[in-house]
């Protein structure tokens, strides 16, 4: 069970991230829905052997590896992300995330609100509702 200011990640709604990779699990931990309007801290579980394909965008990614073993490749350079490591992927750089371990790769990824489709949509609706003086 989650409160307004505390909770278990496993109790947070799972959001559809199937476009990223087969079997990936995504939960938005901190975002506009619970008070962080400018950024979104997302909890991902990337299954063994899966990858989020190469892509680029203008915003940075900030990653913290929680469990398992992943790598991030930035413009062809490979950076190891075993449990407890972190990485920053600069905006504008082509990058890919891979699970290279023997189980799930679990990590936190922080991006600006406009860098997450669920957070962006929620924020737009909340802003519109605020203008109309109604609940989102």
Labelled PLM ranges:
Residues 1-38, 121-136:
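A short, N-terminal "cap"/entry segment at the start of jelly-roll beta-barrel domains
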Residues 35, 91-117:
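Ligand-binding loop in jelly-roll beta-barrel domains
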Residues 43-47, 56-72, 110:
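Short, conserved beta-strand element in jelly-roll/cupin
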Residues 48, 58, 77, 93-94, ...:
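A generic "binding-loop/recognition-motif" signal
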Residues 52-54, 72-73, 89, 95-101:
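Short beta-strand His + acidic residue motifs that chelate non-heme Fe in jelly-roll/DSBH
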Residues 77-91:
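Short acidic-glycine-tyrosine-enriched beta hairpin
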